[in-house]
Each structure stands twice: as structure tokens, then as C-alpha cells.
């Protein structure tokens, strides 16, 4: 199975993007590296400036579904698209693990520990026609890493993700206008992640088993902070990789 890594970075994180891109190439993974400066030149950016000019997530992370949609439509059926935030890192054994688990599914998504209604504005539920208990009480996904098998079904889901993300009522931090209040336990909206979670529940999309976390580390700068204080895990393959690459990766974190 041919793998393709998709990443995005603004000027502040171009060094991290370059690092993970070179790492992916060393594993014979293709790369689709998008920059914020490139994104701002697209007609799409001009059309949705009302969302994309917001400083939160460079426009509530709307760019994420856009670049994934752009990249997957350049790939051949049967290939695998792997999106990751540039602040994350993965162990090479992730590749056979995902290939075994994903099988013929259209995608493989990461589930977190947070409850969806605690991190999703009510309008996101309302305007996605997802204002029901199943959506409220499910665990929210983590959109910083996702895997997509290139096929018609995955393209349709990503296109739907992008379509909902273009609706400011759904993706933004604005006050609700749909006539319903946020839940009492609401903390903060999670933008693209809230949308993807609702879609995953609606379409019954596959989520990865917890074992996948043996091969990935999200926000590796935080891992090094815990490592310095003696609080980082040390038993996973990804922990070994982080120890081996500490010097070079800490330079990325500090620069």
C-alpha cells in the first residue's frame, strides 16, 4: 500500500514540517506539504475570508479539511492518506499496524477521552442535524491525526467535512443562533474536530484501537517536558524513538 503524508504549516512551524517530511521520505512515504502562504493565494481563501481571518487555528482549522480534500483527489484509489499535525511524530511500526487494522475501511480515526457535548457548540449539532443524545454523549475524536484509504467513500466524507466547515455557524466560536443553548458542561468549541466527530457518528466511521498510541505521540514537545520531570512513559516504541531523536527534535521545539 502506498502511503502519503499530508501536512500544513505557517511560517512559525515550517521547520517542524520539513523535519517530519524528511522523516516520512526516509520511510518511502510520499509527501504533500502545504503552507499557509500557499493557502492564502487560493480562491477558496478569498471566498471564506470571513472564517479564515480569525486567529484561532488560522481560521478555526478550516484549512485542514481543505488540504486533505485537495490531496486525496491527487492520489490513486487504494493508496493511503495520512494526515498529521506537524507537532506530532510517529514510529515506523505505525505503518504495518494501520495497514492491518484499516483493511477495506474508508478511514481510521483517533478517538479521545473528552465527551463531545463538552467541547462542541450547540449550533454545530443543530446545523449538522446531529442534535441527539448519540452525538452529545460520544467521545470526541482527535483530528490532529487521521488515516484515509483513497476511495469514493472517503472522498465523499472529506468533501462533507469541508462543506460543513465552510459554515460559520458550525465551525466558529460565535454565539449560537439556532435557538438552543450549549450544554451546562460545555467548555469550549473544537471547530473542525467537532464536525469530524459528528460525521464519524453519523456514518459509523472506524476508530483506531488504543494500541495505536504505542506508535504516535501528539504534541511531542509536551512529551519532552514530562520526560524532563520524570513523568513520560518509557515502554512504547514511540518513547524509544523520542529518546533517540531528543537532540534534533528539541532544537525544533526551541527554535
What are these regions, as identified by a protein language model?
Residues 1-255:
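Glycosyltransferase catalytic domains, chiefly GT-A lineage
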Amino acid at each position: 500500500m502506498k502511503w502519503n503524508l499530508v501536512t500544513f504549516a505557517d511560517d512559525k512551524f515550517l521547520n517542524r514540517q520539513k523535519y517530519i517530511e524528511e522523516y516520512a521520505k526516509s520511510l518511502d512515504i510520499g509527501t504533500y506539504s502545504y503552507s499557509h502562504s500557499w493557502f492564502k493565494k487560493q480562491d477558496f481563501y478569498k471566498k471564506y475570508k470571513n472564517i479564515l481571518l480569525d486567529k484561532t487555528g488560522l481560521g478555526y482549522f478550516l484549512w485542514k479539511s481543505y488540504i486533505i480534500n485537495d490531496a486525496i483527489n491527487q492520489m490513486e484509489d487504494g493508496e493511503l492518506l495520512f494526515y498529521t499535525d506537524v507537532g506530532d511524530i510517529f514510529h515506523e511500526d505505525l505503518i504495518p499496524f494501520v495497514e492491518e487494522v484499516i483493511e477495506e475501511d474508508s478511514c481510521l480515526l483517533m478517538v479521545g477521552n473528552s465527551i463531545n457535548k463538552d467541547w462542541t457548540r450547540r449550533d454545530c449539532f443543530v446545523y449538522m442535524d446531529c442534535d441527539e443524545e448519540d452525538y452529545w454523549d460520544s467521545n470526541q475524536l482527535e483530528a490532529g491525526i487521521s488515516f484515509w484509504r483513497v476511495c469514493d467513500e472517503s472522498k465523499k466524507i472529506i468533501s462533507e467535512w469541508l462543506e460543513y466547515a465552510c459554515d460559520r455557524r458550525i465551525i466558529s466560536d460565535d454565539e449560537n443562533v439556532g435557538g438552543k443553548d450549549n450544554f451546562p458542561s460545555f467548555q469550549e468549541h473544537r471547530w473542525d474536530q467537532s464536525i469530524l466527530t459528528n460525521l464519524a457518528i453519523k456514518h459509523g466511521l472506524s476508530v483506531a484501537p488504543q494500541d495505536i498510541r504505542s506508535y504516535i505521540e501528539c504534541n511531542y514537545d509536551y512529551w519532552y517536558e514530562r520526560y524532563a520531570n520524570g513523568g513520560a512513559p518509557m515502554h512504547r516504541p514511540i518513547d524509544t524513538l523520542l529518546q533517540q531523536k531528543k537532540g534534533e527534535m528539541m532544537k525544533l521545539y526551541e527554535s
